[in-house]
Amino acid sequence: MLGNPSEGSETEPLVDTRIDFPESDRIVAVTVRRVPESEAYPDGVKYAMHYGTRAGETILRYDNAHPEEKGHERHTPDGTTEIDFPGWEVLLARFRTEVMEHERDTGSTE
């Protein structure tokens, strides 16, 4: 399972996981951290959900790494698009689905 939600405080991640797909040479790294609500992080959450190759190529990434400038984004090899933020749990479920579909479609067994 990709990233099990857990209770946490502002200093602990809600999700912090890494998964290797050795047969496809791809990785997943997910971090969701509670942060103080602010203008930059009105939802009180900072996150990065990355799926890519070990060589550093991005296949899929969701993040809010630059909230003052960009907000919530979806990154793929085709470019970056702004997205509506449905909440981190919903976004994590979407990310899980997309990763597993990609792994299945590219012949990975995990």
Describe each model-derived feature in a short phrase.
Residues 31, 42-44, 71-74, 95-103, ...:
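Generic alpha-helix signal with a bias toward terminal, lower-confidence helices
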Residues 69-83:
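Short helix/strand-capping connector loops at secondary-structure junctions
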Residues 79-110:
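Short, compact, well-ordered microdomains
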